[in-house]
Amino acid sequence: MVYLTTIGNKEFILNCDHIEKLEEVPETLITLTNGKKYLVLESTEEVIEKIIVFKKKIYSQGY
């Protein structure tokens, strides 16, 4: 789960396991596996970094 910011400047939490693709248009367009799309203010690099940080946190807890 990662915190992202909509174009309307509202923060929301996205389940990053459902991301199918990221595009810059110039905002970042996130397409989920169910076809739903989100436009966010973060760059693709920022979204990827947030996902990496989240995954490292989850996998380092030893579940």
Task: Give, region by region, the residue ranges found by the protein language model.
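Eukaryotic intrinsically disordered, low-complexity regulatory linkers and tails enriched in Ser/Thr/Pro
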Residues: M1-I13, D17-Y63
